[in-house]
Amino acid sequence: MNNPVDWKAFEYKFSGDPRAAFESLAYILFCYEFKQTYGIFRYYNQPYIETQPANTADGHKVGFQAKYYDAGTQMSSKEQDLKDAIKGAKNKYAGIDRIIFYINKEFSASSAKDKDKPEHQLRIEKYGKNLGIEIQWRGQSHIEKMLAMEELKYVKNLYFNVETGIDHFHESLINHKNSILKHI
């Protein structure tokens, strides 16, 4: 059975530093999505994006940023922060043409009848487009869909399962295998 992603469990499990845990989760999902099997080089305090940009199979140079916001944070209040990250990445990383923002929240739909996206989201995307950077979003629904895939089940358990049984079982299985192989 594939249990749903429980964001409250994530908050509980990583209550000491949920932002760092979310950055780690976003890194794993980004590497998976763009087939970066061995990870992506990064610097300590990497500016504007989480790692060096990745070259994709379809010819793009993509960077990502993870943004973990507490429940009281309005996405509209983060517009300038996101624009600053876009501008900084454009200036720092030659050739970058796409930035993916992993966010633990969903945008609120526009209150206008003829629009789905809120104005602040449209302004952020337009700002990126004017700099030659496509902006993509990976919100809760995207993350939950990715973590529903069988091959990412271990990631979901690592970040969203407060029971330590699976982690201990996996560790004991590896130790058992190593002890057997050690004597061969």
Please tell me what each predicted stretch does.
Residues M1-I184:
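Mixed-charge (Asp/Glu-Lys/Arg
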